[in-house]
Curated annotation (Swiss-Prot):
It is found in: Cell junction, Adherens junction; Cell projection, Microvillus; Cell projection, Rhabdomere; Cell membrane. PANTHER family: MERLIN/MOESIN/EZRIN/RADIXIN. This is Moesin/ezrin/radixin homolog 1. One of its GO terms (cellular component) is rhabdomere. Interacts with cytoskeletal actin. It is a peripheral membrane protein. PROSITE patterns: FERM_1, FERM_2, FERM_3. Residues 466-477 have a biased composition (Acidic residues). SMART domains: B41 (SM00295), FERM_C (SM01196). Residues 456-491 are annotated as: Disordered. Residues 1-291 form the FERM domain.
Length: 572
């Protein structure tokens, strides 16, 4: 018989025998994908009644109520959740599977997530998928086909696809330099503080017949009112429970406190009680295991994971250095190109100045020629005047008429000489001015020639630097399989401290995250459509108004002795 197993990011097909057990199929899956943290996961199938059910490891696959088909369909999913992802998840493959499953639950609204948190989570999801933001390759519209936000959040805000993309991209740029695995981890660290994260809900009734929800998670059992799955009203940590059992539809939980009555509720069907029992046993075992020293196998896994992470970090740092070297080389190349362009512009200006100076020199030379001609003309006229004056002095006995005529000629010649003297004076002044301009032009000509020479002899090696340092980043994950077992009687230790006593949300511990969420909330409020508000939105808003969060609520509902809480449950 063929079976198809769908993980969060792959489809696997196997051929099994009639005798193949659930564990044998499970082991084959985890070996194929390289998963060693097997205790969190299980194989899920749809039974003949259409309900999702976890495969029983020690029964034959073919004897279980798997919906018929060829191939038989199974989903490989996380069945149990860690208390703290940062402390417990070891392998990259485990991290990735949890990340994809939680992300899918948030996007499909199985886990309620406020709008501002949804946008911040989306920015980490983009970093996990695409790596660092690059404005050259990540152009507008790049995220148009990515499913990043719950449809509820999109419907509640009057924002275009471009506006959503801009909002997400703004925060995406904040994560520059973050490894993809680190982005997934940051996503989960924020998501695990959501009220519905990791909770399996079951419809139950108390002895009065009141319809309620039972929530089973890594921290214990919680009771919810029918119309509010965000805010538990009564809580029982695993450390207070010593035994669980059921008889038909009646489910019985025996507290460690022997003075307290049994905690009894009723499920609609026996099969529901079986699922509750299995989840309680698994979660309780993991709860107790976390409070014991790590096994040798887990220690080895953690050591290997640290080595792989360090190697990956070193490779990342090497890549960052290479990228930085490349950026420096590109910057120097750009500076060189800018310098060449500036030099070319300077050459053009210098060439223009050179032409202007040469033109001015030509004009000056022409002016000097004209000045010299005027001076020669003046000298000739002065000589002619002197000849006339000499003649006049030598012809004292000349007749009066001739003498008068000569005097008129001398006077006219004197006027001509005076006029020419003035012209020479003007030309002389103009020549001096032109000489000064020529000196300036020659200086510019010298500078232009020097600039031209410098531009044509500047070294051209500034753009070459460390090109050989560029490398590609390869990321691999490997692993083996492990084992787990269950018990109906719980190991107990009354000295175990309730982990929620000191637990704080990441936003409460991290001021930067708190400020980011606050800024996002303010931005989104401007486009919010209050008519699209859901019941969960209203409940969340009221919880925030009253200063409640996941762990504050859990601390509050676990106060008082067990008897008081059992009585409170009976009276709901």
């Amino acid at each position: 018989m063929n079976v198809r197993v769908t993980t969060m990011d792959a489809e696997l097909e196997f051929a099994i025998q009639q005798s193949t057990t659930g564990k044998q199929l499970f082991d084959q899956v985890v070996k194929t994908i390289g998963l060693r943290e097997v205790w969190f996961f299980g194989l899920q199938y749809t039974d003949s009644k259409g309900d999702l059910t976890w495969i029983k490891l020690y029964k034959k696959v073919m004897s279980q109520d798997v919906q018929k088909g060829d191939p038989l369909q199974f989903k490989f999913r996380a069945k149990f959740y860690p208390e703290d992802v940062a402390e417990e998840l070891i392998q990259d493959i485990t991290l990735r599977l949890f990340y994809l499953q939680v992300k899918n639950a948030i996007l499909s609204d199985e886990i309620y997530c406020p709008p501002e948190t949804s946008v911040l989570l989306a920015s980490y999801a983009v970093q996990a998928r695409h790596g660092d933001y690059n404005k050259t390759t990540h152009t507008p519209g790049f995220l148009v086909n990515d499913r990043l936000l719950p449809q509820r959040v999109i419907d509640q805000h009057k924002m275009s696809k471009d506006e959503w993309e801009n909002s997400i991209t703004t925060w995406w740029q904040e994560h520059r330099g973050m490894l993809r695995e680190d982005a997934m981890m940051e996503y989960l660290k924020i998501a695990q503080d959501l009220e519905m994260y990791g909770v399996n809900y079951f419809e139950i009734r108390n002895k009065k017949g009141t319809e309620l929800w039972l929530g089973v998670d890594a921290l214990g059992l919680n009771i919810y009112e029918k119309d509010d799955r965000l805010t538990p009203k009564i809580g029982f940590p695993w450390s207070e429970i010593r035994n669980i059992s059921f008889n038909d539809r009646k489910f019985i939980i025996k507290p460690i406190d022997k003075k307290a009555p049994d905690f009894v509720f009723f499920a609609p069907r026996v099969r529901i009680n079986k699922r509750i029992l299995a989840l309680c046993m698994g979660n309780h075992e993991l709860y107790m295991r976390r409070r014991k020293p790590d096994t040798i196998d887990v220690q080895q896994m953690k050591a290997q994971a640290r080595e792989e992470k360090n190697a990956k970090q070193q490779e990342r740092e090497k890549l960052q250095l290479a990228l930085a070297a490349r950026e420096r080389a590109e910057k120097k190349q750009q500076e060189y190109e800018d310098r060449i362009r500036n030099m070319q512009e300077e050459m053009e200006r210098s060439q223009a100045n050179l032409i202007e100076a040469q033109d001015m020199i030509r004009r000056l030379e022409e002016q000097l020629k004209q000045l010299q001609a005027a001076k020669d003309d003046l000298e000739q006229r002065q000589n002619e005047l002197q000849v006339m004056i000499t003649r006049l002095e030598e012809t004292k006995n000349m007749e009066a008429a001739e003498r008068a005529k000569l005097e008129d000629e001398i006077r006219m010649k004197q006027e001509e000489v005076h006029k020419i003297q003035e012209e020479v004076s003007v030309k002389d002044s103009e020549t001096k001015r032109l000489q000064e301009e020529v000196e300036e032009a020659r200086r510019k000509q010298t500078e232009a020639a020097a600039a031209l020479l410098a531009a044509t002899t500047t070294p051209s090696h500034h753009h070459v630097e460390e090109e050989e340092e560029m490398d590609n980043e390869e990321e691999l994950v490997n692993g083996e399989n492990g084992n787990q077992d269950f018990s109906k009687d719980f190991d107990t230790d009354e000295h175990i401290k309730d982990p929620v006593e000191e637990r704080r949300t990441l936003a409460e511990r991290n001021e930067r995250l708190h400020d980011q969420l606050k800024a996002l909330k303010q931005d989104l409020a401007l486009s919010r459509d209050d008519t699209m508000e859901t019941a969960n939105d209203k409940i969340h808003r009221e919880n925030v108004r009253q200063g409640r969060d996941k762990y504050k609520t859990l601390r509050e509902i676990r106060k008082g002795n067990t008897k008081r809480r059992v009585d409170q449950f009976e009276n709901m």
